[in-house]
From Swiss-Prot:
Reported cofactor(s): Mg(2+); Mn(2+)
Annotated source species: Lacticaseibacillus paracasei (strain ATCC 334 / BCRC 17002 / CCUG 31169 / CIP 107868 / KCTC 3260 / NRRL B-441) (Lactobacillus paracasei)
Summary of the function given for this chain in its UniProt record: DNA ligase that catalyzes the formation of phosphodiester linkages between 5'-phosphoryl and 3'-hydroxyl groups in double-stranded DNA using NAD as a coenzyme and as the energy source for the reaction. It is essential for DNA replication and repair of damaged DNA.
Protein name as it appears in the record: DNA ligase
Reactions performed catalytically: NAD(+) + (deoxyribonucleotide)n-3'-hydroxyl + 5'-phospho-(deoxyribonucleotide)m = (deoxyribonucleotide)n+m + AMP + beta-nicotinamide D-nucleotide
Binding site for Zn(2+): C412, C415, C430, C435
Gene3D superfamilies, alphabetized: 5' to 3' exonuclease, C-terminal subdomain (1.10.150.20), 6.20.10.30, BRCT domain (3.40.50.10190), DNA ligase/mRNA capping enzyme (3.30.470.30), Helix hairpin bin (1.10.287.610), Nucleic acid-binding proteins (2.40.50.140)
Keywords per UniProt: DNA damage, DNA repair, DNA replication, Ligase, Magnesium, Manganese, Metal-binding, NAD, Zinc
Length: 674
């Protein structure tokens, strides 16, 4: 909040504050729109945004075209082809109280000279999506981007079950809506992220954005995205005259529309709608962060038009964050499998958004410092994305005068080794590979179903094995005897035999399970399989260069660096030797793709860009891989052929600069026929 009303700032003070706010907001916009990794909640962003608006209104000469108040979305910065929106995808104005909403309605009625009917809709917490159909067939899906230029995500959109690939009528049209991740899918994804050593997503909106913008469509397909469609572009060509009719029309074509929209003719009906969904939002299977009012009459919408940034005929009412007050009694630091040390607040139990909350993640030391969170503080909690408990703010007025700052550990709470920051990481990390807490997590992960699949070796058994000094790393599992297991609590002959059998059977697993089970940073189950199939055995992977690993399709430099760093460690090399001596299989024994030696792309690295008349991108990728090609997502000096369709974008320019051979669709068809 501003230190004083905007009108009381001098011009010099206002200019300094405006520059400060713009810098902060632009950083947060970059994190939200481009990186899909916000570091502040929506309400914190909104508060700063409104401060900037107030100062610009008080001093119009300070308004510039590049101010966050004048722009939609963020600068496009990705490997996706660019899409020009013929009709801009604008943002929405918003209000934060029913009083402000009523004032907006009063201005609307005054402007048009008569009462106005609104179509009232839920504000889905996702990201805006445009879908274009030609003769009933989906030809393009794109993100909002900066409002004028978005990203072509057609290949990923094709994996979303609720998006019709063929309409029920052969119409050519554009619709827009929201791509979101259901709450259940979000919970499943974050559980998988943690299992695979990845970073959990902050909320479903960012999970949806990150999933839709994957270079590998198979990743998108696995993440269970969904859509609600709510805008019909150029509705007059279909004789649709109201927003409510447009939703029914789109539903009849096969689109998924939200069933909760309704027409309201007065603010009392709108107030009832708001109260209903303020109460019911937790029970919905998807996240909402407000409601939207749209002038129902489409001709009146056209008459009202738009500002440079927002339509004049719609407004979003954003729910205030549901909060609960509690007291922090402790901050507990725990060590994860990859060594990240994470703080958790232990609090008085409190009811929040339908559940009892007694713990909340504090994410990292920087958050504790930035929010000045202390043990004994009274704090307000909210649920990020209606799911993850977080501390909104500290009620400093209730803090006892002698409360010291929360201590930030300098050494690992498990092993006592000094904690470090790696690269540009915010997280504190223990890099001791023998850290007991990490070893326990690593052993549990190693035995998990998607890794070595050692049935019966869960966290409680692992903890007992450690406590009795029977295992110190995963190789020790293969030297356990019946006599060792007999020392465990409540472990009888049947349990002993079953666990020994499961351990013995795991020796024969194909090596991708071992690679995943080792818990290498950034290496999930899919990456492990790709690497195992590509290199054939663990020895070739261990001796491969970072560049050779990075060039494997769908792997890249981050995983390449992580693998080389991991296998350089003397402790890891010793561990692999021990696994080899324990007769653990180190070769890939899974299915392999047939290699076609006489095709024009056999053994070559191919990049596909642009749109094609005869192919969808997924179908073309599959066909080329069947001919022996390695299809990758980005152009480099290792690329052998760029296959370029229409609207090829930056990949074409990069290929030209690197003198990479370029093949158009006509040439491609000719080669496929040969």
């Amino acid at each position: 909040m501003l230190a004083k009303p905007a009108a009381q700032f001098t011009l010099e003070e206002a200019q300094a504050e405006v520059e400060k706010l713009r810098k902060q907001l632009n950083q947060w916009r970059l994190e939200y729109y481009t990186k899909d990794a916000p570091t502040v909640t929506d309400n914190v962003y909104d508060d700063h945004y409104r401060d900037l608006q107030a100062l610009e209104e008080a001093y119009p000469k300070l308004v510039t075209p590049d101010s966050p108040t004048q722009e939609v979305g963020d600068v496009i910065n990705s490997d996706f082809a660019k899409v020009q929106h013929p009709i801009p995808m604008l943002s929405m104005g918003d209000v934060f109280s029913f009083e402000e909403l009523s004032e907006w309605d009063a201005r609307m009625q005054s402007n048009v000279g008569h009462p106005v009917d609104y179509n009232v809709e839920l504000k889905i917490d996702g990201l805006a999506l445009s879908l274009i159909y030609e003769n009933g067939k989906l030809v393009q899906g794109s993100t909002r981007g900066d409002g004028n230029v978005g990203e072509d995500v057609t290949r990923n959109v094709l994996t979303i079950a609720s998006v019709p690939k063929q309409l029920k009528q052969p119409l050519s049209l554009e619709v827009r809506g929201e791509c979101y991740m259901p709450k259940a899918a979000f919970a499943k994804l974050n559980a998988r992220q943690e299992t695979e050593g990845g970073t959990p997503f902050a909320n479903p909106r960012n999970a949806a954005a990150g999933s839709l913008r994957q270079l590998d469509a198979k990743v998108t397909a696995a993440r269970e995205l969904d859509t609600f469609i709510y805008t019909l572009i150029e509705p007059e060509q279909f004789n649709v005259t109201t927003q409510h009719e447009a939703i029914a029309f789109m539903q009849a074509l096969g689109f998924t529309t939200n069933p909760s929209s309704e027409v309201a003719g007065d603010m009392q009906a709108i107030d009832t709608y708001i109260k209903k969904y303020t109460t019911d939002r937790d029970a919905l299977p998807y996240g909402i962060d407000g409601i939207v009012l749209k002038v129902n009459d489409l001709a009146l919408q056209a008459q009202l038009g738009n500002t440079v940034k927002v339509p004049r005929w719609e407004i979003a009412y954003k729910f205030p964050p549901e909060e609960a007050e509690t007291v922090i009694h402790d901050i507990v630091w725990t060590v994860g499998r990859t060594g990240v040390v994470t703080p958790t607040a232990v609090m008085d139990p409190v009811q929040l958004a339908g559940t009892t909350v007694a713990r909340a993640t504090l994410h990292n030391a920087d958050m504790i410092r930035d929010k000045d969170i202390r043990i004994g503080d009274t704090v307000m909690l909210h649920k990020a994305g209606d799911i993850i408990p977080e501390v909104s703010r500290v009620l400093v007025a209730k803090r006892p005068a002698d409360t010291p700052p929360a201590p930030i550990p300098e050494v690992c709470p498990s092993c006592g080794q000094k904690l470090v920051h790696l690269d540009d990481e915010v997280a504190l990390r223990c890099i001791n590979p023998m850290c007991p807490a990490q070893v326990q997590e690593q052993l549990t992960h190693f035995a998990s179903r998607n890794a070595m699949n050692i049935d019966g070796l869960g966290p409680k058994i692992v903890a007992q094995l450690q406590a009795k000094h029977l295992v110190k790393d995963v190789a020790d599992l293969y030297h356990l005897t019946a006599a060792d297991l007999a020392k465990l609590d409540k472990f009888k002959e049947k349990s002993i035999n079953n666990l020994l059998s499961a351990i013995n059977n795991s020796r024969q697993n194909s090596v991708e399970r071992l690679i995943f089970g080792l818990g290498i940073r950034h290496v999930g189950g899919k990456a492990a399989r790709i690497l195992a199939e590509h290199f054939g055995d663990l020895d070739h992977l261990m001796t491969a260069s970072q560049e050779a690993i990075a060039d494997v399709p769908n792997i890249g430099p981050t995983i390449g660096e992580a693998i080389v760093t991991y296998f350089k460690a003397a402790t890891v090399q010793k561990l692999i030797t021990q696994l080899r001596e324990a007769d653990v299989n180190l070769r890939y024994t899974g299915p392999t793709k047939p290699v076609v030696k006489d095709s024009f792309v056999a053994g070559k690295t191919v990049v596909i860009t642009g749109k094609f008349a005869e192919f969808s991108r997924p179908a073309l990728t599959k066909q080329l891989e069947g001919l022996g090609a390695k299809v990758t997502g980005s152009v480099s000096k290792k690329t052998d052929i760029l296959i370029a369709g229409d609207a090829a974008g930056s990949k074409l320019a990069k290929a030209q600069s690197l003198n990479v051979p370029i093949m158009n669709e006509t040439e491609l068809l000719a080669n496929l026929k040969d």
